Amino acid sequence: MFIHIVGPGDSLFSIGRRYGASVDQIRGVNGLDETNIVPGQALLIPLYVYTVQPRDTLTAIAAKAFVPLERLRAANPGISPNALQAGAKITIPSISNYIAGTLSFYVLRNPDLDRELINDYAPYSSSISIFEYHIAPNGDIANQLNDAAAIETTWQRRVTPLATITNLTSGGFSTEIVHQVLNNPTARTNLVNNIYDLVSTRGYGGVTIDFEQVSAADRDLFTGFLRQLRDRLQAGGYVLTIAVPAKTSDNIPWLRGYDYGGIGAVVNYMFIMAYDWHHAGSEPGPVAPITEIRRTIEFTIAQVPSRKIIIGVPLYGYDWIIPYQPGTVASAISNQNAIERAMRYQAPIQYSAEYQSPFFRYSDQQGRTHEVWFEDVRSMSRKMQIVREYRLQAIGAWQLTLGFTPGPWLLRKFFTIRKV
């Protein structure tokens, strides 16, 4: 498989004819309902034989296919790199030999839709973390979920279901609830026991702790709670995963509640939420810039074994009205819908080489200018390359109902997915 960047005058028909792929193939893999593609749009071409184009080089072809140049040369010993002929056929070597896991979050809808989505994603999934149970100040689990169908389907499809436990309230993630639980030994033990009972009685394979906005004052207590929970779950053969905000140093005041080294020594896996560097309340910019993801990984692997680390990627972006006015809020948009929006408004897509992130601008019916940052097959491919480069455990995503049609194809290209 390789990626074609749409140029001026390109159509799906002309691109398909160029490479020997049908329009339906290209539309299906990329999830396109319409055909009015725009310059700069990245299209995944689902072929393992590349047809050389005028002025192509082997280096350029390797970059399009996201494969090492040496591997491309080795797969095509009869090809002279200095005398490529237009129309020649180049074999794209498989690089799926890296065994990796995946962990994605899923917000329940209803049993029928739960079964359908899980069945769709199961071939490309190791674990699915079902969202979400939330906690009370006394350590109780404060809600119930209709999760039986989702749990049953995941196991049937050789995927491990994890229960996501959060500190969510109607007002968002609550620092205070976590503080109350952690500072009360009775409540803390009660929560550990309640999580164990939930996992064991509902039939989960483990748990993902997603406590956000933990205060610096509770840093050591939080790590101690995770150790206590690990010991309880381990006795039953259950997995403990934690979702943590991305950190590039220990000197970020609002992230001091997370002791990466201490947490990494306790949990089975650490899901790093490597997104929202720019968010709904910020100025426009890349949501998951590769520069910051790389800095996060390098900070993390100095303290946490690389095979415990899962890099979480966003299946969404944001649509800002510009010029940006402080206090305004951007609209969240799925990556798939962002591409559809660029096509609807015929907005050329640009790509930041520094951040490895796509973006575009368009004018709406009211004449307002918008700027949209999102993820496409190029930026996702770079993130998957980084998993391989740093020998990480897995890649993950928030969250599956947002969808990203080329995603499973990319997973199959870069990895052999570990199954139960």
Curated annotation (Swiss-Prot):
Catalytic residues, chain numbering: 212
Class of the enzyme per the UniProt entry, highest EC level: hydrolase
E.C. number(s) listed in UniProt: 3.2.-.-
Pfam family, one: Glyco_hydro_18
Disruption phenotype: According to PubMed:11011148, cells show no effect vegetative growth, spore resistance to heat, chloroform and lysozyme, or spore germination in the presence of L-alanine. According to PubMed:12177332, cells have no detectable alteration in either dormant or germinating spore peptidoglycan, and germinate normally.
Domain remarks: LysM domains are thought to be involved in peptidoglycan binding.
Note: Transcription of ydhD is dependent on SigE.
Annotated protein name in UniProt: Putative sporulation-specific glycosylase YdhD
